[in-house]
Design a protein with these regions (language model features):
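Nucleotide-activated donor-binding/catalytic signature segment of Leloir-type glycosyltransferases, i.e.
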Residues: 263-281
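Short hydrophobic beta-strand element within catalytic cores of glycosyltransferases
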Residues: 317, 321-324
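Acidic donor-binding loop of glycosyltransferase active sites
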Residues: 291-305, 320
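Conserved acidic donor-binding segment of nucleotide-sugar-dependent glycosyltransferases
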Residues: 336-337, 341-348, 357-363
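Donor nucleotide-sugar binding/catalytic pocket of nucleotide-sugar-dependent glycosyltransferases
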Residues: 165-214
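A short, histidine- and acid-enriched strand-loop-helix "catalytic/donor-clamping" loop
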Residues: 134-153, 165-169
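A charged, aromatic-enriched C-terminal amphipathic alpha-helix characteristic of glycosyltransferases
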Residues: 54, 363-416
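Conserved donor-binding/catalytic core segment of Leloir-type glycosyltransferases
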Residues: 18, 210-229, 235-238, 251
Length: 424
Protein backbone atom coordinates (compact mmCIF):
# COMPACT_ATOMS: atom_id res chain seq x y z
CA UNK A 1 0.00 0.00 0.00
CA UNK A 2 1.13 3.55 -0.60
CA UNK A 3 0.87 6.81 1.32
CA UNK A 4 -2.29 8.39 -0.06
CA UNK A 5 -2.31 11.79 1.63
CA UNK A 6 -0.01 13.61 -0.78
CA UNK A 7 -2.29 13.92 -3.81
CA UNK A 8 -3.98 17.19 -4.75
CA UNK A 9 -7.23 18.12 -3.03
CA UNK A 10 -10.42 17.75 -5.10
CA UNK A 11 -12.75 20.59 -6.00
CA UNK A 12 -14.88 21.96 -3.16
CA UNK A 13 -17.53 19.55 -1.92
CA UNK A 14 -20.11 19.42 0.86
CA UNK A 15 -19.60 16.07 2.53
CA UNK A 16 -22.07 14.45 4.93
CA UNK A 17 -20.68 11.54 6.96
CA UNK A 18 -22.92 9.37 9.15
CA UNK A 19 -21.01 7.09 11.50
CA UNK A 20 -20.51 5.67 14.98
CA UNK A 21 -17.82 6.94 17.34
CA UNK A 22 -17.44 10.42 18.81
CA UNK A 23 -15.74 12.75 16.33
CA UNK A 24 -15.84 15.68 18.74
CA UNK A 25 -13.99 13.74 21.44
CA UNK A 26 -11.41 12.55 18.92
CA UNK A 27 -10.82 16.12 17.71
CA UNK A 28 -10.39 17.33 21.28
CA UNK A 29 -7.87 14.58 21.99
CA UNK A 30 -5.88 15.32 18.84
CA UNK A 31 -5.92 19.09 19.44
CA UNK A 32 -4.58 18.49 22.95
CA UNK A 33 -1.88 16.19 21.57
CA UNK A 34 -3.34 13.13 23.24
CA UNK A 35 -2.49 9.74 21.73
CA UNK A 36 -5.16 8.16 19.58
CA UNK A 37 -7.47 5.60 21.16
CA UNK A 38 -7.42 3.13 18.28
CA UNK A 39 -5.40 2.35 15.18
CA UNK A 40 -5.54 4.94 12.35
CA UNK A 41 -8.04 7.15 14.23
CA UNK A 42 -6.23 10.38 13.41
CA UNK A 43 -5.33 9.15 9.93
CA UNK A 44 -9.00 8.67 9.02
CA UNK A 45 -9.81 12.15 10.33
CA UNK A 46 -6.97 13.60 8.26
CA UNK A 47 -8.40 11.91 5.16
CA UNK A 48 -11.75 13.70 5.62
CA UNK A 49 -9.99 17.01 6.28
CA UNK A 50 -7.95 16.62 3.12
CA UNK A 51 -11.11 16.11 1.06
CA UNK A 52 -12.62 19.24 2.60
CA UNK A 53 -9.71 21.65 2.32
CA UNK A 54 -11.95 23.80 0.14
CA UNK A 55 -15.33 22.46 1.20
CA UNK A 56 -17.69 21.93 4.11
CA UNK A 57 -18.35 18.86 6.22
CA UNK A 58 -21.15 17.61 8.44
CA UNK A 59 -20.23 14.66 10.67
CA UNK A 60 -23.19 12.99 12.40
CA UNK A 61 -22.29 10.59 15.24
CA UNK A 62 -25.10 8.15 15.92
CA UNK A 63 -24.65 7.13 19.54
CA UNK A 64 -23.19 9.89 21.71
CA UNK A 65 -24.50 12.47 24.10
CA UNK A 66 -26.38 15.18 22.14
CA UNK A 67 -24.25 18.07 20.89
CA UNK A 68 -23.94 20.45 17.94
CA UNK A 69 -20.67 22.28 17.42
CA UNK A 70 -18.58 23.86 14.68
CA UNK A 71 -14.90 23.15 14.14
CA UNK A 72 -13.32 25.15 11.31
CA UNK A 73 -15.25 24.05 8.20
CA UNK A 74 -16.88 21.07 9.95
CA UNK A 75 -20.23 20.95 11.68
CA UNK A 76 -20.34 18.18 14.30
CA UNK A 77 -23.62 16.68 15.47
CA UNK A 78 -23.95 13.94 18.07
CA UNK A 79 -27.08 12.27 19.41
CA UNK A 80 -28.84 9.14 20.58
CA UNK A 81 -30.08 8.10 17.16
CA UNK A 82 -29.80 4.36 17.82
CA UNK A 83 -32.93 2.86 19.42
CA UNK A 84 -32.86 0.57 22.42
CA UNK A 85 -35.13 -2.42 22.88
CA UNK A 86 -37.55 -3.71 20.25
CA UNK A 87 -41.12 -3.83 19.07
CA UNK A 88 -43.15 -0.73 18.23
CA UNK A 89 -40.92 1.43 20.41
CA UNK A 90 -37.94 0.48 18.26
CA UNK A 91 -39.79 1.22 15.02
CA UNK A 92 -41.00 4.57 16.33
CA UNK A 93 -37.46 5.52 17.37
CA UNK A 94 -36.13 4.55 13.93
CA UNK A 95 -38.82 6.67 12.24
CA UNK A 96 -38.09 9.70 14.43
CA UNK A 97 -34.32 9.31 14.11
CA UNK A 98 -34.61 8.95 10.33
CA UNK A 99 -36.63 12.16 10.13
CA UNK A 100 -33.98 13.95 12.19
CA UNK A 101 -31.14 12.66 10.01
CA UNK A 102 -32.93 13.64 6.81
CA UNK A 103 -33.72 17.09 8.23
CA UNK A 104 -30.03 17.56 9.01
CA UNK A 105 -29.16 16.43 5.49
CA UNK A 106 -31.72 18.73 3.84
CA UNK A 107 -30.48 21.72 5.81
CA UNK A 108 -26.84 20.97 5.04
CA UNK A 109 -27.49 20.18 1.33
CA UNK A 110 -24.55 17.81 0.77
CA UNK A 111 -22.93 17.15 -2.57
CA UNK A 112 -21.60 13.80 -1.30
CA UNK A 113 -22.72 11.26 1.33
CA UNK A 114 -20.67 8.62 3.14
CA UNK A 115 -22.50 6.20 5.44
CA UNK A 116 -20.34 3.96 7.61
CA UNK A 117 -22.96 1.54 8.88
CA UNK A 118 -25.11 -0.99 6.97
CA UNK A 119 -28.01 -0.51 9.38
CA UNK A 120 -31.23 1.48 8.88
CA UNK A 121 -29.46 4.90 8.51
CA UNK A 122 -28.13 3.68 5.16
CA UNK A 123 -31.59 2.64 3.99
CA UNK A 124 -33.34 5.83 5.10
CA UNK A 125 -30.74 8.48 4.30
CA UNK A 126 -29.27 6.56 1.37
CA UNK A 127 -32.64 6.42 -0.40
CA UNK A 128 -33.15 10.12 0.23
CA UNK A 129 -29.72 10.90 -1.26
CA UNK A 130 -30.34 8.80 -4.36
CA UNK A 131 -33.62 10.63 -4.95
CA UNK A 132 -31.66 13.88 -4.76
CA UNK A 133 -29.00 12.45 -7.13
CA UNK A 134 -26.33 12.81 -4.45
CA UNK A 135 -23.38 10.38 -4.76
CA UNK A 136 -23.41 7.78 -1.97
CA UNK A 137 -20.43 5.77 -0.71
CA UNK A 138 -21.34 2.88 1.63
CA UNK A 139 -18.19 2.31 3.70
CA UNK A 140 -18.31 -0.58 6.18
CA UNK A 141 -16.34 -2.75 8.58
CA UNK A 142 -19.09 -5.34 8.98
CA UNK A 143 -19.73 -9.00 8.24
CA UNK A 144 -23.01 -9.79 6.42
CA UNK A 145 -24.82 -12.90 7.61
CA UNK A 146 -26.98 -15.02 5.28
CA UNK A 147 -27.56 -18.16 7.34
CA UNK A 148 -31.35 -18.15 7.67
CA UNK A 149 -34.25 -17.30 5.39
CA UNK A 150 -35.33 -14.65 7.89
CA UNK A 151 -31.90 -12.99 7.73
CA UNK A 152 -31.87 -13.07 3.93
CA UNK A 153 -35.33 -11.51 3.75
CA UNK A 154 -34.32 -8.87 6.28
CA UNK A 155 -31.25 -8.02 4.19
CA UNK A 156 -33.14 -7.72 0.90
CA UNK A 157 -33.88 -3.96 1.07
CA UNK A 158 -30.25 -3.25 1.94
CA UNK A 159 -28.92 -5.46 -0.87
CA UNK A 160 -31.25 -3.80 -3.39
CA UNK A 161 -29.99 -0.39 -2.30
CA UNK A 162 -26.33 -1.40 -2.53
CA UNK A 163 -26.94 -2.80 -6.03
CA UNK A 164 -28.57 0.44 -7.20
CA UNK A 165 -26.88 1.57 -10.43
CA UNK A 166 -26.24 5.03 -8.96
CA UNK A 167 -23.95 3.42 -6.33
CA UNK A 168 -20.85 2.33 -8.29
CA UNK A 169 -18.76 1.30 -5.30
CA UNK A 170 -19.35 -0.47 -1.97
CA UNK A 171 -16.36 -0.82 0.36
CA UNK A 172 -15.81 -3.10 3.33
CA UNK A 173 -12.84 -3.77 5.59
CA UNK A 174 -10.75 -6.64 4.26
CA UNK A 175 -11.65 -9.59 2.08
CA UNK A 176 -13.76 -11.87 4.30
CA UNK A 177 -16.26 -9.10 5.08
CA UNK A 178 -16.39 -8.22 1.38
CA UNK A 179 -16.96 -11.85 0.45
CA UNK A 180 -19.85 -11.99 2.91
CA UNK A 181 -21.48 -9.06 1.09
CA UNK A 182 -21.16 -10.84 -2.24
CA UNK A 183 -22.64 -13.99 -0.72
CA UNK A 184 -25.52 -11.86 0.59
CA UNK A 185 -26.21 -10.66 -2.96
CA UNK A 186 -24.19 -7.48 -3.55
CA UNK A 187 -22.69 -7.40 -7.05
CA UNK A 188 -19.05 -8.51 -6.81
CA UNK A 189 -18.03 -6.00 -9.49
CA UNK A 190 -18.66 -3.08 -7.11
CA UNK A 191 -17.29 -4.57 -3.84
CA UNK A 192 -13.81 -3.31 -2.91
CA UNK A 193 -11.81 -4.28 0.21
CA UNK A 194 -9.95 -1.47 1.96
CA UNK A 195 -7.57 -1.17 4.89
CA UNK A 196 -5.60 1.36 6.89
CA UNK A 197 -2.04 2.04 5.69
CA UNK A 198 0.54 -0.01 7.55
CA UNK A 199 2.38 2.06 10.14
CA UNK A 200 4.73 -0.73 11.25
CA UNK A 201 5.87 -4.16 10.07
CA UNK A 202 6.34 -7.27 12.22
CA UNK A 203 9.91 -7.66 11.00
CA UNK A 204 10.79 -4.40 12.76
CA UNK A 205 10.61 -6.36 16.03
CA UNK A 206 12.25 -9.65 17.00
CA UNK A 207 10.12 -12.73 17.43
CA UNK A 208 9.45 -13.79 21.01
CA UNK A 209 10.06 -16.88 23.08
CA UNK A 210 8.29 -18.18 26.14
CA UNK A 211 10.82 -16.92 28.68
CA UNK A 212 9.26 -16.93 32.14
CA UNK A 213 9.94 -14.18 34.68
CA UNK A 214 8.54 -16.13 37.61
CA UNK A 215 5.11 -14.49 37.66
CA UNK A 216 1.89 -15.41 35.84
CA UNK A 217 1.71 -15.38 32.08
CA UNK A 218 -0.08 -12.33 30.69
CA UNK A 219 -3.05 -12.35 28.34
CA UNK A 220 -4.35 -9.24 26.58
CA UNK A 221 -7.75 -8.35 25.11
CA UNK A 222 -8.55 -5.03 23.40
CA UNK A 223 -11.98 -4.14 22.04
CA UNK A 224 -15.60 -3.75 22.95
CA UNK A 225 -16.56 -5.19 26.33
CA UNK A 226 -19.61 -7.24 25.37
CA UNK A 227 -20.85 -10.81 25.35
CA UNK A 228 -21.03 -10.99 21.51
CA UNK A 229 -17.30 -10.15 21.45
CA UNK A 230 -16.73 -13.25 23.56
CA UNK A 231 -15.35 -11.49 26.64
CA UNK A 232 -17.46 -13.65 28.95
CA UNK A 233 -16.03 -16.76 27.29
CA UNK A 234 -12.53 -15.41 27.84
CA UNK A 235 -13.21 -14.81 31.54
CA UNK A 236 -14.51 -18.37 31.92
CA UNK A 237 -11.40 -19.72 30.16
CA UNK A 238 -9.17 -17.74 32.54
CA UNK A 239 -11.12 -19.22 35.46
CA UNK A 240 -10.44 -22.72 34.11
CA UNK A 241 -6.72 -21.94 33.90
CA UNK A 242 -6.85 -20.45 37.39
CA UNK A 243 -7.99 -23.85 38.68
CA UNK A 244 -5.84 -26.15 36.54
CA UNK A 245 -2.93 -23.99 35.38
CA UNK A 246 -0.91 -22.44 33.99
CA UNK A 247 -1.26 -19.26 36.04
CA UNK A 248 -2.35 -16.25 33.96
CA UNK A 249 -3.34 -12.61 34.39
CA UNK A 250 -5.71 -10.89 31.95
CA UNK A 251 -5.65 -7.23 30.90
CA UNK A 252 -8.86 -5.96 29.27
CA UNK A 253 -8.70 -2.68 27.32
CA UNK A 254 -11.86 -0.97 26.10
CA UNK A 255 -15.40 -0.24 27.15
CA UNK A 256 -18.81 -1.46 26.12
CA UNK A 257 -22.43 -2.16 26.97
CA UNK A 258 -21.71 -5.23 29.09
CA UNK A 259 -18.79 -3.92 31.13
CA UNK A 260 -20.64 -3.98 34.48
CA UNK A 261 -21.95 -7.51 33.86
CA UNK A 262 -18.49 -8.72 32.89
CA UNK A 263 -16.92 -7.16 35.97
CA UNK A 264 -19.51 -8.96 38.08
CA UNK A 265 -18.81 -12.21 36.22
CA UNK A 266 -15.09 -11.84 36.93
CA UNK A 267 -15.91 -11.34 40.61
CA UNK A 268 -18.18 -14.41 40.72
CA UNK A 269 -15.47 -16.50 39.06
CA UNK A 270 -12.99 -15.48 41.73
CA UNK A 271 -10.81 -13.50 39.32
CA UNK A 272 -10.62 -10.15 41.14
CA UNK A 273 -6.84 -10.47 41.51
CA UNK A 274 -6.34 -11.91 38.01
CA UNK A 275 -8.32 -9.60 35.71
CA UNK A 276 -7.81 -5.87 35.22
CA UNK A 277 -10.40 -3.68 33.45
CA UNK A 278 -8.42 -0.71 32.11
CA UNK A 279 -11.21 1.03 30.17
CA UNK A 280 -10.48 3.14 27.08
CA UNK A 281 -6.71 3.50 26.88
CA UNK A 282 -4.29 5.28 24.55
CA UNK A 283 -3.39 3.06 21.61
CA UNK A 284 0.34 3.31 22.31
CA UNK A 285 -0.20 1.90 25.82
CA UNK A 286 -2.33 -0.94 24.46
CA UNK A 287 0.43 -1.79 21.97
CA UNK A 288 2.97 -1.89 24.80
CA UNK A 289 0.67 -4.21 26.76
CA UNK A 290 0.30 -6.47 23.71
CA UNK A 291 4.07 -6.67 23.32
CA UNK A 292 4.50 -7.47 27.00
CA UNK A 293 1.79 -10.14 26.94
CA UNK A 294 2.43 -13.74 25.97
CA UNK A 295 -0.85 -13.98 24.03
CA UNK A 296 -3.50 -11.65 22.61
CA UNK A 297 -7.00 -13.14 22.56
CA UNK A 298 -9.76 -12.28 20.06
CA UNK A 299 -12.73 -14.43 21.16
CA UNK A 300 -15.50 -12.89 19.00
CA UNK A 301 -18.67 -14.95 18.69
CA UNK A 302 -20.13 -15.53 15.23
CA UNK A 303 -23.02 -13.17 15.94
CA UNK A 304 -20.70 -10.16 16.18
CA UNK A 305 -20.65 -8.70 12.63
CA UNK A 306 -17.05 -7.55 12.31
CA UNK A 307 -14.37 -7.70 9.67
CA UNK A 308 -10.77 -8.25 10.77
CA UNK A 309 -10.33 -6.03 13.84
CA UNK A 310 -7.28 -3.79 14.22
CA UNK A 311 -6.22 -5.63 17.37
CA UNK A 312 -5.20 -8.62 15.25
CA UNK A 313 -2.95 -6.50 13.03
CA UNK A 314 -1.39 -4.87 16.07
CA UNK A 315 -0.74 -8.12 17.92
CA UNK A 316 0.98 -9.59 14.87
CA UNK A 317 3.02 -6.41 14.40
CA UNK A 318 4.46 -6.71 17.92
CA UNK A 319 5.10 -10.45 17.32
CA UNK A 320 2.67 -11.66 19.99
CA UNK A 321 0.76 -14.79 18.92
CA UNK A 322 -3.02 -14.50 18.73
CA UNK A 323 -5.65 -16.95 19.93
CA UNK A 324 -8.67 -16.45 17.66
CA UNK A 325 -12.20 -17.75 17.57
CA UNK A 326 -13.37 -19.43 14.37
CA UNK A 327 -15.40 -16.34 13.43
CA UNK A 328 -16.29 -16.40 9.71
CA UNK A 329 -14.22 -13.26 9.14
CA UNK A 330 -11.13 -14.96 10.56
CA UNK A 331 -11.25 -18.47 9.10
CA UNK A 332 -10.52 -17.56 5.45
CA UNK A 333 -7.40 -15.53 6.23
CA UNK A 334 -5.70 -17.29 9.15
CA UNK A 335 -3.99 -20.67 9.28
CA UNK A 336 -3.83 -22.19 12.77
CA UNK A 337 -0.16 -22.64 13.63
CA UNK A 338 0.96 -19.60 11.63
CA UNK A 339 1.00 -16.76 14.13
CA UNK A 340 -2.22 -17.96 15.74
CA UNK A 341 -4.26 -20.75 17.26
CA UNK A 342 -8.01 -21.06 16.75
CA UNK A 343 -10.89 -22.32 18.90
CA UNK A 344 -14.65 -22.79 18.52
CA UNK A 345 -16.39 -19.50 19.24
CA UNK A 346 -18.32 -19.61 22.50
CA UNK A 347 -16.41 -22.66 23.78
CA UNK A 348 -14.58 -21.50 26.92
CA UNK A 349 -13.14 -24.96 27.57
CA UNK A 350 -11.54 -25.17 24.13
CA UNK A 351 -10.27 -21.61 24.47
CA UNK A 352 -8.62 -22.58 27.77
CA UNK A 353 -7.11 -25.63 26.03
CA UNK A 354 -5.62 -23.47 23.24
CA UNK A 355 -4.19 -21.01 25.78
CA UNK A 356 -2.67 -23.90 27.72
CA UNK A 357 -1.18 -25.37 24.53
CA UNK A 358 0.61 -22.14 23.68
CA UNK A 359 1.78 -21.44 27.23
CA UNK A 360 3.14 -24.91 28.04
CA UNK A 361 5.00 -25.69 24.80
CA UNK A 362 7.95 -23.31 24.30
CA UNK A 363 8.77 -24.74 20.86
CA UNK A 364 5.19 -24.19 19.65
CA UNK A 365 5.14 -20.70 21.11
CA UNK A 366 8.37 -19.73 19.35
CA UNK A 367 7.01 -21.11 16.07
CA UNK A 368 3.80 -19.08 16.49
CA UNK A 369 5.71 -15.87 17.15
CA UNK A 370 7.95 -16.49 14.14
CA UNK A 371 4.80 -16.95 12.05
CA UNK A 372 3.28 -13.59 12.96
CA UNK A 373 5.03 -11.87 10.03
CA UNK A 374 3.55 -14.25 7.45
CA UNK A 375 0.13 -14.04 9.11
CA UNK A 376 0.30 -10.23 8.94
CA UNK A 377 1.27 -10.29 5.26
CA UNK A 378 -1.72 -12.51 4.49
CA UNK A 379 -4.26 -9.94 5.71
CA UNK A 380 -2.98 -6.87 3.86
CA UNK A 381 -5.34 -5.15 1.40
CA UNK A 382 -4.44 -3.34 -1.83
CA UNK A 383 -6.52 -0.17 -1.25
CA UNK A 384 -6.23 2.21 1.68
CA UNK A 385 -9.08 4.18 3.24
CA UNK A 386 -7.66 7.46 1.94
CA UNK A 387 -7.13 6.16 -1.60
CA UNK A 388 -10.71 4.95 -1.64
CA UNK A 389 -12.08 8.38 -0.67
CA UNK A 390 -9.89 10.25 -3.16
CA UNK A 391 -10.76 7.86 -5.97
CA UNK A 392 -14.51 8.03 -5.32
CA UNK A 393 -14.68 11.82 -5.05
CA UNK A 394 -12.59 12.30 -8.21
CA UNK A 395 -14.88 9.89 -10.07
CA UNK A 396 -18.02 11.72 -8.95
CA UNK A 397 -16.52 14.95 -10.24
CA UNK A 398 -15.74 13.47 -13.65
CA UNK A 399 -11.98 13.50 -13.06
CA UNK A 400 -11.28 9.87 -13.84
CA UNK A 401 -12.33 6.26 -13.59
CA UNK A 402 -12.76 4.38 -10.34
CA UNK A 403 -9.23 2.99 -10.24
CA UNK A 404 -9.95 1.02 -7.08
CA UNK A 405 -12.48 -1.10 -8.97
CA UNK A 406 -9.56 -3.04 -10.45
CA UNK A 407 -9.53 -4.71 -7.03
CA UNK A 408 -13.18 -5.72 -6.74
CA UNK A 409 -14.01 -9.24 -5.68
CA UNK A 410 -15.01 -9.95 -9.27
CA UNK A 411 -11.38 -9.51 -10.35
CA UNK A 412 -9.32 -11.33 -7.73
CA UNK A 413 -6.87 -9.96 -5.18
CA UNK A 414 -3.99 -7.93 -6.70
CA UNK A 415 -1.16 -6.72 -4.48
CA UNK A 416 -1.30 -2.93 -4.31
CA UNK A 417 -3.14 0.07 -5.73
CA UNK A 418 -0.83 2.14 -7.93
CA UNK A 419 0.00 5.66 -6.80
CA UNK A 420 -1.92 8.43 -8.63
CA UNK A 421 -0.18 8.98 -11.93
CA UNK A 422 1.85 5.77 -11.68
CA UNK A 423 1.44 2.85 -14.06
CA UNK A 424 -1.35 0.46 -13.04
Amino acid sequence: MVDDRQTAAPAAIRLLVIQFGDYRQALWAREHQQPETYRAQYYSMACFEKLLQRGQGLIVCLDTEPYEETWHNFRLVGGRFIPRGGGWGYLRHVWLASRRLIQLAETFAPTHLIIRTPAWPLLMVGRWALRQQIPVLPLFADYFYTGTLKTRLKNLPLIRLLNHPAIPLVANHNYPACASMVQAGVAAAKVVPYDWPASRHPREMPAKDLARSGGPYRLCYAGQLSHPKGVGDLLKAVALLHRAGPEVDLDLFGDGPDRAELQELARRLGLDDRVRFHGLTANEKVLAAMRAAQLVVVPSRHQYPEGIPCVIYEALEVRTPVVLSDHPSFRPKFQPGQGCLMFRAGDAAQLAHRLREALTQPELYGHLSQGTAAAWEAIQCPVTFGQLLDDWVAYTQGQGELTCRQFTLALGQPAVLASPGAPA
